[in-house]
From Swiss-Prot:
F(1)F(0) ATP synthase produces ATP from ADP in the presence of a proton or sodium gradient. F-type ATPases consist of two structural domains, F(1) containing the extramembraneous catalytic core and F(0) containing the membrane proton channel, linked together by a central stalk and a peripheral stalk. During catalysis, ATP synthesis in the catalytic domain of F(1) is coupled via a rotary mechanism of the central stalk subunits to proton translocation. It comes from Shewanella sp. (strain ANA-3). The keyword Membrane applies. The gene is atpH. GO terms for molecular function: proton-transporting ATP synthase activity, rotational mechanism. This is ATP synthase subunit delta.
Amino acid sequence: MAELTTIARPYAKAAFDVAVEHNAVDTWAEMLTFAALVSENETMQPLLTGSLASTKLAALFISVCGEQINEQGQNLIKVMAENGRLKVLPAVSELFAQYRNEWAKEVEADVVSAAELSSEQQQQISNSLEKRLARKVKLNCSTDAALIAGVIIKAGDLVIDGSVRGKLSRLSEKLQS
């Protein structure tokens, strides 16, 4: 995964710079998401790792994407095909989304709770994170009964484990040391 990120980073950065320059960040995000889905398609996978000439592969990929990819997006596809990097499109899309969130002063936070959170509880968590991170927060909520009670919040590099399972685990570690 780290290797894919390293390979994808320059493509994502270049795409993001072009998107900002042309005031088309959302358009680029949609294009890259679509292109990533195409590259992950089980029919397309063998072609990406096969011996098809890069120009033919790029033309095929662009024809499959159709009108979902504009001329600048097509140029990115061509460059990535020439370098044999179309298989990293999902990582490019993911990195682009991270750059977009950073640029827009937004962050996605994954909140895992033992029981479903009410909209009021979600709003309280969102408000607290917005104050702490100085960013607009978008919550992705899920449940996991194995937490016993409480929540685990992951937002960027920040991890807050307020679950009973986490507290029991930390207590167990202290008792064993």
